[in-house]
């Protein structure tokens, strides 16, 4: 999903933003992203924390229950709603691959009918405020617990 940035936009005193990096090794591209909050808006801060927490919750379900990509995103949607957010399916996860990602697999993680393999898929969680005021994003590769701090 590529969108042009609006010219002249600057972070304000009470903003939420994300960094999205795509490190490359030869022709292969990874992906990682996280939201940050400037200021002290409690809703924005909770949204950013919840996006990362939901990522790890879904990743844990992937490890324990060996669910398909479809089932993982259905679970993420239920959990997001229980937390008071909407899950944005415009960012449905993707295969790690050469760029563009569709060169190896044309579908998204949310559409995958089998269990995604470790180190091959990016799980994307994008939460939105139900009133559309802000959102938060967290994404990383599906990896086991050894790759994350306890």
Question: Can you annotate each of these PLM segments?
Answer:
Residues 1-150:
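Active-site neighborhoods and metal-handling regions in enzymes and metal-associated proteins
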């Amino acid at each position: 999903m590529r969108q042009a940035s609006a010219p002249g936009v600057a972070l304000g005193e009470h903003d939420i933003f994300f960094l999205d990096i795509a490190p490359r090794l030869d022709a292969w591209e990874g992906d990682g992203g996280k939201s940050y909050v400037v200021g002290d808006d409690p809703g924005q801060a909770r949204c950013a924390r919840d996006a990362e927490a939901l990522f790890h919750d879904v990743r844990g379900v992937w490890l324990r229950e060996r669910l398909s990509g479809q089932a993982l995103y259905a679970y993420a949607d239920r959990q997001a709603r229980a937390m008071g957010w909407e899950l944005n399916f415009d960012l449905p996860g993707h295969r790690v691959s050469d760029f563009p990602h569709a060169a190896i697999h044309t579908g998204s993680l949310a559409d995958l009918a089998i269990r995604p393999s470790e180190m091959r898929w990016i799980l994307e969680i994008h939460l939105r405020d139900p009133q559309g005021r802000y959102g938060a994003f967290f994404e990383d590769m599906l990896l086991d617990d050894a790759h994350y701090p306890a």
